[in-house]
Amino acid sequence: MAAVVEKQEAVAEFYDNSTGAWEELFGEHLHDGYYEPGTTATIPAHRAAVVRMIDEALRFAGVSTDDPAKKPRNLLDVGCGLGGTCLYLAKKYDIKCTGITISPEQVKCAEDLAAAQGLENKVSFDVGDALDMPYQDGEFDVVFTLQCIDHVQDKEKFIREMVRVGSPGAAIVVITYTHRDLSPTEQSLKPHEIKTLKKICDNIVLSSISSTHDYVNWMTSLSLKDIKTADWTQNIIPFYPLLFKVSFSMKGFISLLMKGGWSAIKVVLAVKMMSKAIDDGLLYYTAVSGRKPN
């Protein structure tokens, strides 16, 4: 238990320290964008791509945002960062959204952004633990997590908690990095692959990276229906050259160093390793969704 608490504190400190730097460079969405493969990313294009990622995730999970009768009433974003997803959905689709993050600094920033956009009555943000969320059973009809679950070692418990707070029929949506699935003859990844993933995790305070097969198994064990997966790796890699270009520009590097310190610089180093791991067929960007039984 002490190790878990220590890890949670490290994650909170990481985001408390580095959030301001990334917000200044790329805005309130602290996640990858969804691009057409082969696109050349720019800052304006990235702002469109990050909100497209949200729309694509909901579309993938079969969540209707067009039909008022089917539109979600209450969405939870687990690992909400600066609240960008909640703010976007509340503003565009008039959906009530709640975000939870382990970082008090992120909640403060999210609340300030909500106030600036006049959305205080449509969104709310809480500091809390994704493994023990302060919500009632069945409270949300969409439970969504975008690039958060890898900070947690017990991913099955993370998903179980998502399912608990989901209402009957709720969409459970996980967007995350995964490692390659093992072949039928393999018991584990190769030693050099394990070493690569550990280096990536250590740089950005991740606990571990799991396979797509693992996520399907966890959702299956929780009796979710309509489980499906999609490989979106080619849709996110156009962002990497832009990240490197901006981060290693004079303005970008100084901003990262002054506002984010070593924590922010380590993110760029991790993305360099992630880019190579993708090229090597080790790392993927994956969408996984299921539906809680009625």
Curated annotation (Swiss-Prot):
Subcellular location: Vacuole membrane
EC number: 2.1.1.-
CC per GO annotation: plant-type vacuole membrane
Recorded family membership: Belongs to the class I-like SAM-binding methyltransferase superfamily. gTMT family.
Function description: S-adenosyl-L-methionine-dependent N-methyltransferase involved in the biosynthesis of biologically active monoterpenoid indole alkaloids (MIAs) natural products including vindoline. Catalyzes the conversion of picrinine to N-methylpicrinine (ervincine).
Keyword presence, Membrane: yes
Name assigned to this protein: Picrinine-N-methytransferase TMT2
Renumbered residue ranges of the record's region SAM motif III: 165-174
A Pfam family annotated for this UniProt entry: Methyltransf_11
Keyword RNA-binding set for record: no
Motif position, Vacuolar targeting signal: 137-143
A GO biological-process term: methylation
